[in-house]
Regions:
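Terminal low-complexity "docking" segments
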Residues: 1-101, 105-130
């Protein structure tokens, strides 16, 4: 596949050193939450980060559950737009959506295991692999 990039979704709530890494390495990145984001929310937000060799080396020494890696040919804008659709879910019997931390490795694998082939195709969208 041409132009496949590796991306990380890193959870600031699980990996507070993310901000130091972003300042130091300055990889292309975006918060998955819509702007404007308060500092309080930013501290627990998921970030989509291009997994450059330096970022991958940094992630290798982090303790789980910092997030997940994925492969995609899509642009950051397209990928962010797609992933944002899964940040909120409606639980049975509830009227208000709740945050869903799909990017937590403790959540993503159980989720994927129960999706039908069509649901998995829809969930992955522009993602080639997780």
């Amino acid at each position: 596949m041409d132009n496949v990039s590796i991306w990380a979704i890193v959870d600031a709530a699980a990996e507070p050193d993310i901000f130091t890494m972003l300042d130091t390495l300055d990889p292309p990145h975006a918060c998955l939450y819509a702007e404007p984001v308060t500092d309080e929310i930013l501290g627990v937000a998921p970030f989509l980060i291009l997994a450059t060799p330096d970022v991958l080396a940094w992630l290798k020494v982090r303790r789980p559950p910092w997030g997940i890696l994925l492969e995609s040919q899509a642009s950051m804008t397209t990928l962010r737009q797609h992933l944002r659709k899964y940040l909120h879910v409606l639980l049975p019997g509830e009227k208000t959506p709740v945050y869903f931390r799909f990017y937590d490795p403790r959540n993503i694998w159980p989720l994927i295991s129960v999706l039908s082939p069509w649901e998995l195709h829809s969930f992955l969208g522009p993602i080639n692999a997780i």
